[in-house]
């Protein structure tokens, strides 16, 4: 029996780490939203400022923000590590879930199954990775339920007061976890059949919680008064009080949306497992406690929301723990030989459904800026239009994922931008007339080299690299072929890739051939590529078809001989009449132009 228990414990631990690994590996697919940026901004200074800000400038309880401030000081303050903090909290939550399954239902399998079900549940997954209080909300709610059940079993004043401490912790963590306390009270009244002694103990526990929370109580009252004033001023007020701007009304559509989110978009599957568990476990009081956790909490929240503006799905994420336990009980009610198979099918469907719960309208700023950072060069300028100083998420992402020099170069002045050779033209309003006008002013001298992002019916965010020629003044072949410089793109032992920049004032009369040559130190020809302009590498343009004033970028690749010796080589450019071989001369009489020296590895 001890050996079985130890194996179950080790399996539970393994499942916790598997879920944690899955969540950590998924961080790269989660993207910052407005509230997460606020979490960083309000914890940027010292701890006293963090608490002061929540007390006087916001409407939140202080524990999570204080703990996040501490996490940032000692662990790290990147977006990734911010999400790791939430994963750390979920690991502790899942460890408690295992204990609940083992003790409430006398089945380690219930705890193990609940861990895996929660790990694949989109509701738990989404808010378990947010840089907001929700992961810790789930932790303290689970701890409170654990202590509440422990008191119900032992019925001692000590366990009651211990439970009371968790209630105080919940109030300091997030005000709306109080819905769980209401669910606990309902269970006590309708299922536990409390004795007079139990009522005295629970009242004592709640009084202790309020006593501990009382120093913050005036702050909470002030927050409510401030909130009412602000909501009324902006016309967002809904109900007697609450947060009208960030909550939603209790409607049938809102309820269906919550059900869809809680069930990972599979309400039929969850309902089936719920019915199975209900048939086989309805006599167990512990089952009704998790049912109230899973269903009672949202019912209470939605009812209260009809009077006070207190509901949005993220405020009651802790109900997901109850849902996971209800599902685990349902699956373990099946014949033992098919329980693991049923779990695998359930988890697989849930994992498959997770992507469907994410909005396709999310702009993946981090990915876009990281691409820019890889391509950025010294001297680049970031030109943003329109400039929205209030878009804090964008500024946070830019400051953390662009190179420091590029972020410092940020401007919305097109004249200042043109002082640089390379401009990163950034816009979230591509079809705006002013944006189009300024883009078209830049484009003749700064042709687009690369486009990062997209503009589609779901979202629009474009970052376009616009680049001027390397030289401010040309070197002209003959009288018709001004050459504006060279960019050496890559050099390897097998090839050299080069961009040649051309712009003419008038269309040449002839179709010239352009030759890019590679010479060794003795002046011997090693490699050569001849032909018309290969514009952007995909359009052949004869010189007698060039449009005046348009910049042409000739993509050239020199294939090097296999036996080439490593060393320094000279690039050389010629322009000639391909019919006669006669070269165009430069002003100094030279029939060639020396370009860059390159080192062949």
Range-by-range predicted roles:
Residues 12-16, 207, 273, 282-283, ...:
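Signature aromatic-anchored transmembrane alpha helix within multi-pass, membrane-resident enzymes
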Residues 50, 114-115, 127, 159-173, ...:
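Membrane-interface alpha helices of multi-pass inner-membrane proteins
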Residues 127-128, 135, 179, 267, ...:
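Hydrophobic/aromatic-rich transmembrane helices and adjacent perimembrane loops
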Residues 144-162, 331:
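Membrane-interface transmembrane helices that cradle and orient dolichyl/undecaprenyl
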């Amino acid at each position: 029996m001890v050996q079985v228990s130890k194996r179950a414990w080790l399996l539970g631990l393994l499942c916790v780490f598997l879920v944690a690994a899955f969540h950590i590996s998924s961080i790269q697919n989660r993207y910052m939203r407005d509230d997460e940026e606020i979490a960083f901004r309000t914890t940027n200074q010292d701890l006293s400022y963090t608490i002061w800000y929540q007390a006087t400038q916001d409407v939140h309880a202080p524990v999570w923000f204080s703990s996040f401030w501490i996490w940032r000081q000692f662990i790290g303050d990147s977006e990734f590590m911010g999400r790791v903090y939430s994963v750390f909290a979920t690991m502790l939550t899942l460890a408690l879930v295992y204990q609940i399954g083992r003790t409430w239902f006398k089945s380690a399998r219930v705890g193990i199954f609940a861990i895996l079900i929660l790990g694949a549940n989109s509701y738990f997954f989404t808010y378990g990775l947010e840089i907001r209080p929700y992961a810790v909300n789930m932790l303290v709610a689970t701890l409170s339920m654990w202590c509440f059940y422990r008191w119900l079993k032992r019925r001692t004043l000590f366990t009651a007061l211990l439970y009371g401490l968790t209630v105080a912790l919940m109030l300091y963590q997030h005000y709306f976890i109080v819905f769980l306390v209401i669910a606990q009270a309902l269970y006590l009244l309708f299922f536990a059949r409390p004795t007079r002694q139990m009522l005295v103990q629970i009242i004592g526990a709640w009084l202790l919680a309020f006593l501990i929370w009382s120093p913050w109580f005036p702050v909470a009252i002030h927050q409510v008064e401030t909130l009412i004033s602000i909501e009324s001023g902006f016309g967002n007020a809904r109900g007697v009080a609450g947060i009208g701007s960030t909550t939603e009304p209790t409607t049938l559509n809102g309820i269906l949306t919550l059900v869809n989110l809680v069930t990972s978009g599979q309400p039929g599957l969850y309902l089936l497992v719920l019915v199975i568990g209900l048939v086989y476990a309805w006599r167990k009081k512990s089952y009704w406690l998790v049912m109230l956790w899973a269903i009672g909490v949202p019912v209470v929240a939605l009812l209260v929301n009809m009077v006070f503006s207190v509901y949005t799905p993220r405020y009651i994420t802790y109900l997901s723990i109850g849902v996971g336990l209800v599902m685990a009980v349902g699956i373990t009610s099946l014949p033992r030989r098919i329980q693991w198979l049923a779990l695998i099918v359930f988890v697989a469907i849930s994992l498959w459904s997770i992507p469907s719960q994410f909005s396709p309208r999310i702009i993946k700023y981090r990915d876009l800026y990281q691409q820019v950072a890889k391509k950025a060069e010294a001297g680049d300028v970031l030109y943003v239009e329109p400039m929205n100083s209030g878009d804090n998420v964008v500024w946070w992402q830019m400051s953390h994922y662009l190179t420091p020099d590029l972020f410092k170069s940020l401007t919305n002045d097109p004249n200042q931008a043109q002082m640089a050779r390379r401009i990163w033209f950034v816009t979230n309003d591509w079809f705006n007339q002013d944006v189009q006008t300024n883009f078209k002013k830049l484009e003749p001298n700064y042709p687009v080299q690369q486009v990062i992002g997209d503009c589609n019916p779901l979202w629009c965010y474009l970052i376009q690299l616009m680049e001027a020629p390397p030289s401010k003044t040309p070197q002209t072949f003959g009288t018709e072929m001004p050459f504006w410089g060279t960019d050496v793109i890559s050099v390897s032992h097998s090839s050299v890739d080069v961009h040649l920049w051309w712009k003419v004032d008038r269309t040449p009369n002839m179709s010239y051939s352009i030759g890019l040559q590679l010479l060794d130190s003795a002046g011997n020809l090693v490699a050569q590529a001849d032909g018309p302009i290969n514009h952007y590498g995909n359009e052949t343009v004869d010189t007698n078809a060039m449009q005046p004033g348009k910049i042409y970028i000739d993509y050239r690749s020199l294939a090097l001989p296999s036996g080439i010796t490593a060393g320094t080589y000279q690039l050389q450019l010629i322009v000639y009449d391909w019919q006669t071989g006669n070269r165009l001369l430069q002003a100094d009489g030279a029939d060639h132009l020396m370009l860059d020296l390159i080192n062949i590895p």
